[in-house]
């Protein structure tokens, strides 16, 4: 990057070729090293012997972990932090006027996006990427869990933690000694165009991130291109129309090594153009049992032998998790794990953190936290909640994520949230956006959309409450014995759980 040119940060620009290796980076500095995706990559480079340091705005569990590994973390972002670095890594959350970017540019240092580091780590490994609007973290976590249990010791880079036993969490990143790397492929900014995985999993292609892509056609085209870069197999859900459209758009040579999956019997599907098909059959949960039973019909193209009908008993609820399991198990089998061993390991998977994660119970009111932030994810979550808690009142505190997403999907959010009995919508988590750019968008945008629904919202109480603390107290006062309250969203609503549990204790008379 020339020092005489203006600073342009393009996450889609590929900085390395297939021959590059981590040692080529030299001393590497991460801006925002405590971020979920950045901390994992920093740890993996450190394990490869690269000299790594970084900066962040505040201490966190992630920065604490990095420091215990011997990685220096500076708090506050200043020009001097990049003085010793040869390579500076940024994420899409970092702007060109960041003082460390400005200093690195002025000094002529190599500035690369986090996706460049992930692409570099994939070189020389059997890489599995998981892309899609929904299910990335759960599918990549489940696949990593299966491979760990199979003794493969994979590396994995997952945008979150994994649920462990007794309410514990396991780190979402690991630098394994095996030759497999599992990673989420973030489609939000187009940076997944850099990846050339051995296996590309596409969990679904429902429109999202239209602020980047502009329209659904360009969004789907990005997935078609991503599938075309896979050097081995493509695994894609065709339960949603967009996924089927992507499959149909794939060139014949890509279809020939594609494995589609879904809940529709094969004979009821259109011609798949030579793609193999995994049928998810008999998915059900005995009400309140906590076990999702299904059978995966794995074709010879997956097993490299005879077709196999494999029973699976999942501890993660919902049909959406049956789909996630189909993708994870299919990939594991393609990587050499037996169908029986893959299914057994999947049955011990407790879920990714913040995915249907029980945070506590007060006076038999259960609080569950979930990352769902798209209308389809919320609908799947609430369907799973009805299966898991069939006799309970389902209450939701939802924090919308991004003003643009709230604007694009207000009516869809209203329809999905109508599956709950009570809903409070808090202030919107802005992430990379500014309220000033969306002056007419607020929690009331969704509430107003709900008021316009004819039947879907009948019986659902829905209110906007900007302040999360007030929202927690209000919901606690409404709760009764046996209710389940979900905190839902991709922002900082996850920090509300303790406030909510405390509020429930303070208003325990309403819970009895």
Swiss-Prot record:
Domain of life: Bacteria
Pathway linked to the protein: Cell wall biogenesis; peptidoglycan biosynthesis
GO biological process assignments: cell division; cell wall organization; peptidoglycan biosynthetic process; regulation of cell shape
Catalysed transformations (reactions): UDP-N-acetyl-alpha-D-muramate + L-alanine + ATP = UDP-N-acetyl-alpha-D-muramoyl-L-alanine + ADP + phosphate + H(+)
Subcellular location: Cytoplasm
Keywords: ATP-binding, Cell cycle, Cell division, Cell shape, Cell wall biogenesis/degradation, Cytoplasm, Ligase, Nucleotide-binding, Peptidoglycan synthesis
GO function term, MF aspect, one: ATP binding
GO CC annotation terms, alphabetical: cytoplasm
Residues reported in the UniProt entry to bind ATP: 132-138
InterPro entries, alphabetized: Mur-like_cat_sf (IPR036565), Mur_ligase_C (IPR004101), Mur_ligase_C_dom_sf (IPR036615), Mur_ligase_cen (IPR013221), Mur_ligase_N (IPR000713), MurCDEF_pg_biosynth (IPR050061), UDP-N-AcMur_Ala_ligase_MurC (IPR005758)
Main location: cytoplasm
Entry EC number(s): 6.3.2.8
Family: Belongs to the MurCDEF family.
Function: Cell wall formation.
Name of the molecule in the record: UDP-N-acetylmuramate--L-alanine ligase
Taxonomic lineage: Bacteria, Bacillati, Actinomycetota, Actinomycetes, Bifidobacteriales
């Amino acid at each position: 990057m020339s020092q005489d040119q203006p600073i342009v940060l393009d996450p889609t620009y590929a900085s390395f070729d297939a021959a590059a290796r981590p040692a080529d980076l030299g001393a590497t500095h991460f801006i925002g090293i405590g971020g979920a995706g950045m901390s994992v990559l920093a740890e993996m480079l450190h394990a490869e012997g690269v000299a790594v340091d970084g900066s962040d705005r505040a201490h966190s569990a992630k920065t604490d972990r990095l420091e215990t590994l011997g990685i220096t973390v500076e708090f506050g972002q200043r020009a001097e932090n990049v003085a010793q670095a040869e390579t500076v890594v940024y994420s899409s959350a970092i702007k060109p006027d960041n003082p460390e970017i400005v200093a690195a540019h002025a000094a002529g240092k190599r500035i690369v996006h986090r996706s460049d580091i992930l692409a570099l780590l994939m070189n020389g490994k059997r890489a599995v990427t998981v892309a899609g609007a929904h299910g990335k973290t759960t599918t990549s976590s489940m696949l990593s869990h299966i491979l760990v249990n199979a003794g493969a010791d994979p590396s994995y880079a997952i945008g979150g933690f994994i649920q462990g036993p007794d309410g514990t969490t396991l780190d979402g990143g690991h630098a394994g000694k095996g030759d497999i790397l599992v990673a989420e492929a973030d489609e939000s900014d187009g940076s997944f165009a850099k990846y050339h995985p051995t296996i590309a999993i596409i969990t679904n292609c429902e429109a999202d991130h239209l602020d980047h892509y502009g329209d659904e056609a360009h969004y789907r085209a990005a997935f078609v291109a991503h599938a075309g870069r896979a050097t081995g197999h493509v695994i894609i859900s065709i339960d949603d129309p967009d996924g089927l459209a992507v499959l149909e758009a794939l060139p014949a040579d890509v279809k020939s090594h594609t494995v589609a999956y879904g809940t529709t019997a094969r004979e009821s599907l259109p011609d798949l153009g030579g793609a193999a098909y995994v049928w998810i059959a008999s998915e059900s949960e005995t009400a309140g049992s906590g076990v999702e039973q299904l059978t995966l019909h794995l074709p010879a193209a997956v097993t490299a032998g005879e077709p196999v009908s494999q029973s699976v008993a999942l501890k993660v609820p919902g049909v959406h998790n049956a789909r996630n399991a189909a993708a994870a198990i299919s990939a594991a089998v393609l990587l050499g794990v037996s169908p029986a061993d893959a299914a057994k390991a999947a049955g011990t998977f407790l879920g990714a953190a913040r995915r249907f994660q029980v945070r506590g119970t007060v006076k038999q009111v259960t609080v569950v936290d979930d990352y769902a932030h798209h209308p389809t994810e919320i609908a799947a979550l609430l369907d799973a909640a009805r299966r898991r808690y069939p006799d309970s009142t389902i209450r939701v505190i939802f924090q919308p994520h991004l003003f643009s997403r709230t604007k694009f999907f207000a009516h869809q959010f209203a329809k999905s949230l109508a599956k709950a009995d009570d809903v409070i919508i808090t202030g919107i988590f802005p992430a990379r956006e500014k309220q000033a750019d969306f002056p007419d968008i607020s929690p009331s945008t969704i509430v107003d959309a709900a008021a316009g629904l004819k039947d879907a919202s009948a019986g659902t109480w829905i209110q906007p409450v900007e302040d999360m603390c007030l929202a927690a107290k209000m919901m606690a006062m409404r709760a009764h014995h046996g209710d389940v309250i979900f905190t839902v969203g991709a922002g900082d609503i996850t920090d509300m759980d303790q406030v909510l549990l405390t509020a429930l204790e303070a208003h325990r008379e309403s819970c009895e």
